[in-house]
Amino acid sequence: MSTLPRLAKLGAATAAAAFAYGAFVEVRSFRVRQVCVDVLPPGSQKLRILHISDLHLLARQRRKLEFIAALSGLEPDLVVNTGDNLSEPEALEPLMAALGRLRDVPGVFVFGSNDYVGPRPANPLAYLVEESGHSAAAHSRPMPTEALRAAFQSFGWTDLTGHRAEYELRGLKIELRGTDDAHWDLDDYGLVAGPPAPGVDVALGVTHAPYQRVLDEMTDDGLNLILAGHTHGGQVCVPGFGALTTNSDLEPSRAKGLSTQETAAGSSWVHVSAGLGTSPYSPYRFACPPEVTVLTLRPAP
């Protein structure tokens, strides 16, 4: 056999193995990422934030539900949910049952587009050349948005969609603000704009999609840390290189993890979650395992 056919067969076998790994192994390899952020006043106690995003849950996803149910064992001080919880209305009840152990933990949330309507079949390669939009929303299956909101609020969690809130945790005065989904141009930062209130120890921003305009506005207002999701970490990444897309105007190098947003007014930390799920029409991850994050906020040096 000549060299070229051998190489072709080897390439095909490698591609098939990579696809099988991404579709059947990595997409279910849920993990917890630990991140430290030095943003608290000197002498403060540490604060643990559990950042959950992009579950895209189907009711039949037993392993994902078991992982979610075990998150209470991380003992967070605050839960931040940055949206895209559901892929079908039938997933609402099992989701809330799995989250039930976090019922007594303070929490906040904002919604993403898939908390309003369900996903639709799409060509995943299209994300490499342009951002997905919301033109097809009218043809998508409605999600139980208000039931989801009410369920989170029954836990005592605060809806930050266009709202500000304050918490007292571990002796810290924490201010939070959030926006609706910028990917659908639903963000109206004017609803929450302005500097943190006097006496606030740490100010956090929460949004689903990390578009530059939202990150800039929050940074200009002096927020210490901004939490977002939406990107799936790129979902399909190149080993040694990283993400190819973020489905937003954020640089691919910032598709997941901690980075800084710089404006003329200053800088803010930004944490983008790679999320726990995928669209049910592209249930595949490669070099980008599904995750939640525990952010430990510590005193700044």
Explain the meaning of each model-derived region:
Residues M1-G11:
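Membrane-penetrating hydrophobic segments
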Residues A8, A15-A98:
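N-terminal active-site segment of His-dependent metallophosphoesterases
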Residues D38-L50, W157-T158, R164-L176, P198-V202, ...:
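Beta-strand-turn-beta hairpins that frame and shape the catalytic cleft
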Residues H51-S53, L78-D84, G107-S113, L160-G162, ...:
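Active-site neighborhood of phospho(di)ester-bond hydrolases with catalytic His/Asp-centered motifs
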Residues L57-R62, L86-E90, N114-P121, S140, ...:
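Active-site environment of divalent metal-dependent phosphoester hydrolases
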Residues R63-Y167:
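Core catalytic region of metal-dependent phosphoesterases/phosphodiesterases
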Residues A122-W157, T161-H163, L169-D216, S282-R285:
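Binuclear metal-dependent hydrolase catalytic cores centered on His/Asp/Glu-rich metal-binding motifs
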Residues P210-T293:
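Conserved beta-sheet core of the metallophosphoesterase superfamily
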